[in-house]
Amino acid sequence: MRPNFSLTAVLAAALLVTPAAADEVEDALEAALEAYRAGDIALAREEVDFAATLIGQMKAEGLGGFLPEAMAGWTREEGDTSAQALGAFGGGIVANATYVGAGGSFELTLMAENQMVAAMGAMLSNTALMGSMGTVKRAGRQRYVVTREGDIQALINNRVMIQITGSAPVEAKEAHFLLIDLAGLAEF
C-alpha cells in the first residue's frame, strides 16, 4: 500500500518557488522519490515533509511582503515571519512587525492556514458578531472591526487574519491597516 501523503501537492507547489530555493526543494523531492522507490517509506516521508517545510517558509516570506511600510513619524521593527510558528494553534504561517511612534506602538500580525483563522472566521465573517466586538468599518469591500480596546481585526477572503494590537492611537493603527494591499492579500 502506498503512503498517504500529498506528493502531488508538494510537487505542484515546488513549481511556484524561486529558482535558487527550487533547487533545495527539488533535491528534497528527488530524494523522497528515490527513498520511496527503494522502499524506505520513513525517509521518503521525511524528505517530503522537508520539502513542504521549505515551501511553507517561502510562502511565509510572501505573506511578510504584505506588511506595510511605516508611515512618516513611525518606524517598523521586523518580527517573526515563518511557517509553522503557530504550533499551539495548529500550525500555519505568520508574519508580523512592530510599529513604534511618538504616540505608542502596535504589532501588526498576519496569520494564514491555521486553526485559529478558521475558528475566528465564523466571528469575523458575520457582521452582527463583529458588531458585538466593537465598531464595524469598511475599506473598499473589506469589513474590519475596531474593538472597544482600539485594536483592529479583519478576515481577508476567509483565509488570512489581520490583527493590530497595542498602545498606539487607533487612528495610527487604522492608517497602517489601510496601507495593506487587501486585494493582493485576498489572492495570497
Roles of regions detected by a PLM:
Residues D23-A83:
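Charge-rich, low-complexity N-terminal segments
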Residues E24-L33, R37, E47-D49, G87, ...:
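A short, solvent-exposed beta-edge/loop patch
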Residues M1-A9:
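Bacterial N-terminal signal peptides that target proteins for export
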Residues E61-E149:
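Short, solvent-exposed recognition patches
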Residues A14, A51-K59, A119-M123:
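Generic hydrophobic, helix-prone segments enriched in Leu/Val/Ile
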Residues T8-L16:
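Bacterial N-terminal signal peptides
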Residues T18-A22:
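Sec/Tat signal peptide C-region and signal peptidase I cleavage site
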